């Protein structure tokens, strides 16, 4: 199956928001605890994809539907971020660290810590420690590798990076996306880097930007 980091973020987000909006806690059962442990383990393994058994090869004429290097994916360096095979759009990643999805992971790892601290679920201390460590390492990876510059020399977030110096300037018309970073709770909407990123994405510097008579984006 196509692996996307955000596919594991959403169950954690949904469980957390249900609790916060309604007070409901029945979702935090043994299955939730086990699933959370698996998510933390998988994201940790994929901090260095060389340790992962995941491969994806599809017989297709559409290069976006399969991974290069016999299903292993493109070359990368370890950054602290967690590796992704595919984007929310289901297209494969050009570079293996999808910044919006790593931002989303940072947010939901904070949710995990809050859930297990306040509700004192099974194995809380170990899960909190693992989530805190992973959150810090992914955030450090974002801070060290996720930035690039636009044509004006402004500091912006890249869409994807490989840790080897390559980066893409674009966005995905889904959530998570760079444009949706404040919506997800990753950064403030007035953040200087976010605003520069937003201006860049919503301009011809984004190769997928389109402007017509009545709309642009």
Predicted segments with their positions:
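Solvent-exposed loop and edge beta-strand segments that line ligand/cofactor-binding
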Residues: 1-6, 88-102, 158-177, 186, ...
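The tetratricopeptide repeat
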Residues: 11-14, 108, 181
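Aromatic-rich carbohydrate-recognition surfaces in CAZymes
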Residues: 1-64
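Generic structural signal for hydrophobic core residues of well-folded globular domains
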Residues: 15-18, 116, 184-185, 201
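Catalytic cores of carbohydrate-active enzymes
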Residues: 44-59, 97, 110-193
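Long, well-ordered core segments of solenoidal/helical folds
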Residues: 1, 33-52, 68, 77-79, ...
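Short, flexible helix-coil linker/hinge segments at the edges of structured domains or between repeats
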Residues: 49-93
């Amino acid at each position: 199956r196509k692996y996307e980091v955000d596919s594991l973020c959403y169950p954690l987000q949904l469980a957390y928001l249900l609790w916060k909006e309604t007070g409901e806690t029945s979702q935090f059962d043994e299955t939730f605890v086990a699933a959370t442990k698996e998510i933390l383990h998988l994201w940790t393994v994929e901090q260095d994809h060389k340790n992962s058994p995941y491969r994806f090869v599809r017989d297709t004429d559409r290069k976006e539907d399969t991974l290069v290097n016999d299903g292993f994916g493109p070359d990368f360096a370890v950054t602290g971020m967690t590796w992704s095979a595919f984007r929310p759009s289901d297209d494969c990643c050009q570079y293996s660290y999808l910044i919006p999805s790593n931002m989303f992971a940072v947010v939901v790892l904070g949710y995990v810590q809050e859930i297990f601290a306040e509700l004192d679920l099974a194995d809380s201390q170990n899960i909190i420690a693992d989530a805190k460590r992973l959150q810090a390492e992914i955030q450090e990876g974002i801070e060290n590798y996720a930035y690039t510059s636009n044509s004006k020399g402004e500091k912006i977030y890249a869409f994807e990076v490989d840790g080897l110096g390559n980066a893409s300037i674009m966005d995905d018309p889904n959530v998570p996306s760079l444009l949706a970073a404040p919506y997800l709770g990753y950064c403030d909407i007035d953040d200087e880097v976010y605003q520069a990123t937003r201006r860049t994405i919503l301009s011809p510097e984004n190769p997928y930007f389109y402007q017509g008579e009545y709309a642009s984006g």
